[in-house]
Amino acid sequence: MNRPERLQPGVKLRDADKVSRIPVKIVPSERETMLRKPDWLRVKLPASNQRILEIKQALRSNGLHSVCEEASCPNLAECFNHGTATFMILGAICTRRCPFCDVAHGRPLKPDADEPVKLAQTIRDMKLKYVVITSVDRDDLRDGGAQHFADCIREIRKLNPEIKIEILVPDFRGRIDAALDILSTEPPDVFNHNLETAPMHYRKARPGANYQWSLDLLKRFKERHPNVPTKSGLMMGLGETNEEIAQVLRDLREHKVEMLTLGQYLQPSKFHLPVERYVSPAEFDELKVLADELGFTHAACGPLVRSSYHADLQAQGKEVK
């Protein structure tokens, strides 16, 4: 039996190379079998792309990454044109192979020790008032990257004392207590960790993750920081039912999560998990009603909603869909 070829540091694996060794194999989609995208998912491009180019240049010149680009987010043009971006720290190579996600897999490079300062300077130069900081999974690091998150929060606040910071963290697999100890030194204004889908779909969609671990991470952070809102996001269209999603919402509330994002899964390439259904705006509205009834303080539910989509407005309690 041939051993898998050893990954070279810094080499990005995408598409078929990325998903070749996941537990549930994916048959590449054929155009004829792919569901037709409904009109409500067609994104209008802004009239001017000048602001988009400016933000991309600011990221490039400082060696920074945005999840907007790395994950091929459909809202990139809208968010960049409004001067907002979700920064992705700890590099652009993930140690996981989630087949719904377009971020590259591989063996990451050592974290950039200068990234926290560069990030803080870029945010100051962009005059941002609210930022979302996320990262790839870093199972290669003993703390899962928690110290780097704390360093970034500290440096951002040094240069931007009035800013609000939301962090969208990985699951810190096997390191929850150590990670939360570190994050307690520099707690964010919003703590976000995405469950992504219902538990019965984890094996195919989130290999290496565990539904209960993720719920425990959210609850244990909340126990340490009762005044910091906790938040989670889900995708629809991976084979789940509306009732399965409703149960996830109940689980989130039982674990003291207050903010919710719920959006439509879109297939990044033919090598990723196929879209099994397009959920109508009316169904998202029904789930929004349920979320409100369950006691979520903020619930953004709609086809194009993503976990950091208009995160500043979500945090202010304004309706986003």
Swiss-Prot record:
Documented EC number(s): 2.8.1.8
Residues of the Radical SAM core domain: 80-297
Binding positions for [4Fe-4S] cluster 1 per the UniProt entry: C68, C73, C79, S308
Top-level taxon: Bacteria
PROSITE patterns: RADICAL_SAM
CDD domains per UniProt: Radical_SAM
Binding positions ([4Fe-4S] cluster 2): C94, C98, C101
Keywords, alphabetical: 4Fe-4S, Cytoplasm, Iron, Iron-sulfur, Metal-binding, S-adenosyl-L-methionine, Transferase
Protein name according to UniProt: Lipoyl synthase
Species the sequence originates in: Shewanella sp. (strain MR-7)
